């Protein structure tokens, strides 16, 4: 089988909006968990989240971002960084031997709610046509394949918290088997109170340390809760 190497990375997270910011946060043991007034107002048990601090419109053209929910927008910014980091030229990115396997736990819940609200108001025309790509199950790959002109393999994997790992593993296999030469792979999800509320209802979120973020969702810490 063919050898597989990683040539470019990109990231948008609560620890930073690019490789260097995230790296420095990790070196300095900085937590990206912050208090959410919105969660408290909606009476969730957990009042904390790890939401990226970024103004999406500063990074993405208006004509591109209108197709995206926040999760896809994070992915777009990360992929832009990965392309630059890899040194790939446009002819390498837009090529029949270059594909994409991207994932998300689900579509943009914010836009699903918007569509539901407009329908209940008996005014569905007000939601507009761009809400479709934001809420498709394949939104993670579809909203990146078009602006980056991906011509090869292109699909979305969704497998809960294992999504990005499965995408990267599948991308590796496609290269090993010689089906694609280059694959862009990863995943993202938006942070929205409605999605959080579902996990909050099953008591899967941290609620013990709402006023002490030091221990909240701290990996490998026996006091985390």
Regions found by a protein language model. Name each.
Residues 55, 219-220:
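Small disulfide-bonded, cysteine-rich extracellular recognition modules and tandem repeats
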Residues 38-88, 102, 137-151:
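A glycine- and small-residue-enriched flexible loop/hinge segment at structural boundaries
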Residues 3, 97-99:
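Residues that mark the start of a beta-strand
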Residues 9, 102-104:
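Glycine-rich beta-strand-to-loop/alpha-helix junction loops that act as flexible
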